[in-house]
Amino acid sequence: MFGIRSGNNNGGFTNLTSQAPQTTQMFQSQSQLQPQPQPQPQQQQQHLQFNGSSDASSLRFGNSLSNTVNANNYSSNIGNNSINNNNIKNGTNNISQHGQGNNPSWVNNPKKRFTPHTVIRRKTTKQNSSSDINQNDDSSSMNATMRNFSKQNQDSKHNERNKSAANNDINSLLSNFNDIPPSVTLQDWQREDEFGSIPSLTTQFVTDKYTAKKTNRSAYDSKNTPNVFDKDSYVRIANIEQNHLDNNYNTAETNNKVHETSSKSSSLSAIIVFGYPESISNELIEHFSHFGHIMEDFQVLRLGRGINPNTFRIFHNHDTGCDENDSTVNKSITLKGRNNESNNKKYPIFTGESWVKLTYNSPSSALRALQENGTIFRGSLIGCIPYSKNAVEQLAGCKIDNVDDIGEFNVSMYQNSSTSSTSNTPSPPNVIITDGTLLREDDNTPAGHAGNPTNISSPIVANSPNKRLDVIDGKLPFMQNAGPNSNIPNLLRNLESKMRQQEAKYRNNEPAGFTHKLSNWLFGWNDL
């Protein structure tokens, strides 16, 4: 505020104005808490006496110190006066506020406060200025405590929510890692309620027969539907379907027994092939498979049917997918190239040394295979006869059960049926069908009768397994133009008769010389 300059010491304390505000601020802050008493004039006198009793060497320093102390005391007095003035002003202001509206000071000075959760009743009684200050302090402290309390409540609730959310997250994670299926499914509820008449799309993997039977029922029964979560449902449905199949089979067997026996005897036909070496048995079976479908499961035929022997499996014979009387649907799961019910059955294989039984699915295939009787295959003469139970028992040396007696058929019935269709067809001129002996011309037989086709060939069909095919010498085509009344000389007949006479004479009058015998032995003329 102002400076004091000393005449004796100009360099010690030149300016005190810079220190005055600091002292005033310090005194002001202290005066707000507690007012200080004013210094007594006796203290000043003591300082003066102390200064007067000092020696001459320290006189200058004492004068300067006393001057500074006096200046500080004076400034403190000024600060105390200003504090008193402020207190008086505050008191008058508080009195004026109480006189105007009887409201506390915090109403005129609103602040952003946090609204507590509970309503607090505030007292508005008339008090003095000191009580107002205490009330303000108490209200501020109360508001602070309420804010802290509400904040703690919010923090606790937030923590509880976070803990519950964390627990829910943990539970959800634990439930996701749980692989155990639910104990009750929608299928179980539907089984309990038994409502609805249309099954869901997920249950359409039931067999075709079973789904076809469900259309005849009025309501949908979920007990007969496979359940993914119920292993016993498949066994139960299999038993139901098996019982249904058995009932249908018994009914069909009693009603169609005659029809089944006739169809069985007319569909399967078996033959016996013999006379071949064992080294060409696979080639022989493959050769006879070209005439028709062989029912026996030979390994050599699997690759030809598109079946790998390493992964070959025989499927069950019972039908769980289709109705037995329904011929438009597959009877069961079949392999490639097997589309009927008879192919699923395991047929017995009868074979031995240089003989084998082959069963065809049609009589026409068996008749075609019988034509291979007496032919040469891979350098071996083979025979082919129709199947009979007695023949196989003699070849195999064992007794055949009636269940395994499959493939016996009546050849004459098919021969008579095929004779009517082939009777109008002329036989080849160089083929003669005989009953076991070669048909030869007699010398007394006229040439005209020999050229007549009706006298040469019989009306028996050419593919009969009981007949033998023989080839004649080939002179018949040249003799067909000679009639019974023809005067044309038969040169061929005369030449042939002369050659035969000369040959007979030569054999009867053959010379017995050593040279002739040696030449015949060397050149082989004796074999001619």
From Swiss-Prot:
Regions of compositional bias (Low complexity) in chain numbering:
23-50, 127-141
Q: Which Pfam families match?
A: RRM_Nup35 (PF05172)
Compositional bias, Polar residues, is annotated for: 51-64, 97-108
Single GO molecular function: phospholipid binding
Q: Name one GO cellular component term.
A: nuclear pore central transport channel
Enumerate the spans annotated as RRM Nup35-type domain.
265-394
Alphabetically ordered keywords of this record: Cell cycle, Cell division, Coiled coil, Membrane, Mitosis, mRNA transport, Nuclear pore complex, Nucleus, Phosphoprotein, Protein transport, Repeat, Translocation, Transport
What ranges does the record give for the region Disordered, renumbered to this chain? 23-64, 88-144
- Name one process (GO BP) from the record: cell division
FG repeats sit at 2-3, 61-62, 195-196, 274-275, 291-292, 523-524
Modified residue annotations for Phosphoserine: S458, S464
Q: What is known of its domains?
A: Contains FG repeats. FG repeats are interaction sites for karyopherins (importins, exportins) and form probably an affinity gradient, guiding the transport proteins unidirectionally with their cargo through the NPC. FG repeat regions are highly flexible and lack ordered secondary structure. The overall conservation of FG repeats regarding exact sequence, spacing, and repeat unit length is limited. FG repeat types and their physico-chemical environment change across the NPC from the nucleoplasmic to the cytoplasmic side.
* Name recorded for this polypeptide: Nucleoporin ASM4
Q: What is the lineage of its organism?
A: Eukaryota, Fungi, Dikarya, Ascomycota, Saccharomycotina
